[in-house]
């Protein structure tokens, strides 16, 4: 455990020195942006103080410096990392209660920290905090199966550390389950598989094997302990003597290790890609006419459209103006933008609801996104890149657009979530797609064979009449993974064997996608309390919610792309006129207690579940959308960071009140 702690301390801390990722940009494997998390800290003294934590070698020095940092800079962007350092050094100094307190606060700000979760799970198991140990170990294993290697480690280093983390997590969970008198052989087998050199794992497994009357396996494990552990050798010899059978004790348990590893590497079961591939949305129309007609009206279908005059929502009239003279708009048979005396015609539109971007296509196949977009609610042109990028963004300089750089290229930056079946041809900037917008098969899978067999009414292959990906049969995690193809900012994109970018031609329809660690992104994407500030992280927020983690909620619990009322219900909400119905099927105890529970009159907007549990605090450029973290309101982090960096939902309506009032109200509500 001590070696594991030392191995990950620098991993977590030095991550703040690494290149960070812009928000709202495709995340490609081995690709980072040109600024660091630490460089975004404006206070130079604060940055210097944090560097002293990184440079501390002695646990006592690191403990002192980290505690000094959190005391002096209680509102720092780096609190998650600083409290992480407090927790790890406190464990080394046997300050276990303080380690748990600091570690839990760090995880509150950044829950997706598997190495810290592993350390706390082991400590909690040791202290008989079994429920917490099981929860933390399980969360760590979940994240380790999703998050790619930290960018400050090379693949070899991560390949060495990750098995240790997984082994330690399985061991902690097994130890906690064992203390609850639960049989935990499966987790111990996996722990031994990931770390076949740890005698403590084999010792605990021997005890479980004895409980199960598996004397042969127990003897083999005890023999391994006797040979490899000075600390446990005497206990192992005593137990072997009691067993009284040395005939098979010296054979090492290779069989169980190999089997556990094979079990661990099996991929989730998803419907397989069909050989005949993709049919296109029109193939769905004859059998699914209502769904097809409804989909055609949605923002998904119209995410990217070839230019048609009736699709334009921007103001290209003579009175339409941008705030700068660097660019002007006009209309000459079709809309155009003029920058540095060069004219760029609109060939495609991006978006169709409250905001619209414009694309010009070059003769060589590249599609370039004009820097300004039109915001319909405010009826104004905005510099999109300037609003979402950190200061100094090159693509936000309108006068430089005629350089037509990769930074403003549609295929490289936007197409993976705005078009269907995207494939890189000769270069990423010239990638081609089968369908503009998001079509049926992006969600339901490749359907050529399905459509062909359905058209024939072929009963020889009844399985073909089922959709390639059936949401009715999927778990909530499988279903969310489909939506996450476009709605998860942190997804790391890798090309398929034939340069496919957002679809598969063989293997699993929705393959497991690695996620870039969240602390590798620009601080502009977060509030200081750790919640997501930008709407591009909507799946990341939702997968933190108890509704997803402990329940069965998925995107389709509340949304549907097949509703007929899209013109008036642009959020595709299933219960547009009665939003509480999204929550009450699971939380039925509140159905007749809405006013009592919400402390607002039943039927009022304030009494709706989403008003308190999904507040409008997330940026969508010029307006706010609802957070999808779905949490119980608190006030303590607002007291620490302030309303701007930790919005309290009560104060978003009761603006005349203060945070002390909010805390008192929430305390009374809980009591």
Where are these regions (language model features)?
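N-terminal leader/linker segments that initiate helical-solenoid repeat arrays
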Residues: 20-82
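Short coil turns that delineate tetratricopeptide repeat
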Residues: 74-77, 111, 145, 196, ...
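Alpha-solenoid helical repeat scaffolds
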Residues: 80-85, 115-119, 151-156, 168-172, ...
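Alpha-helical linker/edge segments of TPR/alpha-solenoid repeat scaffolds
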Residues: 92-97, 126-133, 163-179, 211-220, ...
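Primarily the internal scaffold of c-type cytochrome electron-transfer domains
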Residues: 216, 244-247, 251-275, 282, ...
